[in-house]
Amino acid sequence: MRTEYADRLPVDWRDYVELCKPRVVLLMLLTVIVGMYLAAPGWVSLRLIAFTLLGIGLCAGSAAAINHLVDRHIDSIMARTKKRPVAYGRVSVKQALWFAVIIGLMGLSLLILFVNQLTALLTFITLIGYAGVYTGYLKRATSQNIVIGGLAGAAPPLLGWTAVTDQLDPQALLLVLIIFTWTPPHFWALAIYRYKEYQDAEIPMLPVTHGIQFTKLNIYLYTVLLLVVSLLPFVVSMSGWIYLLGALILGIRFLVWAHKLYFTDKPVVAMQTFRFSILYLMLLFVFLLVDHYF
């Protein structure tokens, strides 16, 4: 593999940025910010926001770098990922490992020193859950990898909440439940589009193990469940009418995409559904934030 020779090649700083999966981390940090503001009756101090985002962001980048490291052989097979820094050989295994360890320790240190120990602990558990349990084991072990491993990816709003309150709260767990329910239809839509690549890499994603039509049915059912779960903040008086209207519009639109995906054989619809799911989560959390203050 090219990775063997990466120590001899000049490394661009952009390769290290790519290791952190910045677009994924930015979406995650949006949910952290919303969690912080929903936990506070007023405004949150900029100092706390800065240290929380920096600490959690560094830890998320560390987990992403470990994902690149562990999945380098798989990534080299798949067209979508074969040019990732470690898989392509621009960053060596040793370089990626040291980078992940250093920024992970930096992130945890910032959280311990400037936020609180509970947030640092939960962030560490999340890092281990994603980088160790999901990437290292679940991804290759079961077709329910995304469902079980999705809990780690759903934690960011809880981390934002505890950064402000230094305690666990049922309302914060509601935000976790929303992302946890959103994760399967989000990733399974991509898995349908990339079906052949996952099959060639021998990754037991649901479309590979149970077929594409069965996966489409599961996407549809999870999208219905997501619509119901997304209304819970209004039901428990955590949010008001602005959020309810936004959640209904977004949820119904997501259902339309799931319906369209179920009844079509066009692969492009799976990618369109995947892309809408990202927009859905962004806007849903924006509605939560807007509703909180207006």
Curated annotation (Swiss-Prot):
GO cellular component: plasma membrane
NCBIfam families noted in UniProt: cyoE_ctaB (TIGR01473), PRK04375.1-2 (NF003349)
Similarity remark: Belongs to the UbiA prenyltransferase family. Protoheme IX farnesyltransferase subfamily.
Catalytic activity reported: heme b + (2E,6E)-farnesyl diphosphate + H2O = Fe(II)-heme o + diphosphate
MF-aspect GO terms: protoheme IX farnesyltransferase activity
Name assigned to this protein: Protoheme IX farnesyltransferase
Pfam families per record: UbiA (PF01040)
Other facts noted in the record for this chain: Carbon 2 of the heme B porphyrin ring is defined according to the Fischer nomenclature.
Function: Converts heme B (protoheme IX) to heme O by substitution of the vinyl group on carbon 2 of heme B porphyrin ring with a hydroxyethyl farnesyl side group.
Pathway: Porphyrin-containing compound metabolism; heme O biosynthesis; heme O from protoheme: step 1/1
Organism: Legionella pneumophila (strain Lens)
Cell compartment(s), UniProt: Cell inner membrane
Keywords, in A-Z order: Cell inner membrane, Cell membrane, Heme biosynthesis, Membrane, Transferase, Transmembrane, Transmembrane helix
